[in-house]
Amino acid sequence: MSTGPSHISVCIACRNEADRLGACLESVAWADERIVMDLGSTDDSVAVAERNGARVVRRDAVPIVELIRNEIAAHATHDWILVLDPDERVTPGLAAELRRAAGREDVDAVVMPRMNWDLGYPPSNPNERYEQQLRMYRKSRVQWPVIPNALPQVPDSRTYRVPSTDDTVLVHDRNRNIPEVLDRIVRYAPLQAQSMIDRGQVFSARAMFVSLGTRAKRQFIDGKAWRDGVPGMLRAAILVGFHFYIWAAFWQLSGARRTPEDDRFVQRVGRWLERGQHGYRAVTAPARIVGGLGDRARRMFRRA
């Protein structure tokens, strides 16, 4: 039971995150309560949590945290729940916004900008730099959906949106290295694919190509990934690749059936690319440009 409209409980699910959990907890030292649900850590995660003043609750591991968001919230003393992962940190500016929002009777949820860091760098494009995340809510009025990567849906009239600035972000230090990328894919791709099946979606090659093409356009072209150099291009490739694995899992979990309709569509795409005047030249343009620059550089060095 909440002891007041402005009291906030921070809820964190954790498994073997001792190297990052401390910074996460320190960033919310201002909160009225901090709960860490440990999922069978074999490192010093529990000691780190207790050393930082958090209350530790233990349970068996689960593949994804969405399965236990509501369970963690049930352990909280207060109505306002701030959901964090161990690889996230609340900036001082965001903390001030959250405390103000918690004191408003007309608000049931708070959407905040999250800045995702991949391979040590955040995106510079404003459209990609600030990912809108509903991460604070009243548990008496909102339930967390048990779906991979899903967020609660709350009417805009009952939602407060934190301004998107670097001073008011939730810092997300994800995908620090390739093993972390692969771990995320292995855990989430099959479950997201299964959720697509559970919602009644039917696999088709056309839908897969449209989805992946749309995501590639968003990341590489609309998101101007090239402006962030190698980290930007790798980030875009990781995000598109993640969805490729979701579709691969979707096809496999749907029965891995090869159908004439899918074959015809894929073959049409292949012939279109093979003609070389449109898609093939567009797809191979980066390689041809790099190759041309390399040839030019070699000629310059030979002349020198």
Q: Can you annotate each of these PLM segments?
A:
Residues W30, R51-G53, Q132:
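Short, structured coil segments at secondary-structure junctions
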Residues V46-H75:
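Conserved donor nucleotide-binding strand/loop of the catalytic core
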Residues M1-S27:
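N-proximal low-complexity "stem/linker" segments adjacent to membrane-targeting elements
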Residues H7, D32-E33:
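Residues at the starts of beta-strands that form the adenosine-phosphate
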Residues E66-A73, W80, T91-R257:
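Catalytic-site signature of metal-activated, phosphate-bearing donor transferases
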Residues W251, R257-A304:
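Long, positively charged, glycine-interspersed low-complexity recognition regions
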Residues D19-G22, D43-N52, G93-L94:
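Acidic helix N-cap motif at the loop->helix transition within catalytic regions
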Residues S27, D38-V48, A61, D85:
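A conserved acidic beta->alpha catalytic loop
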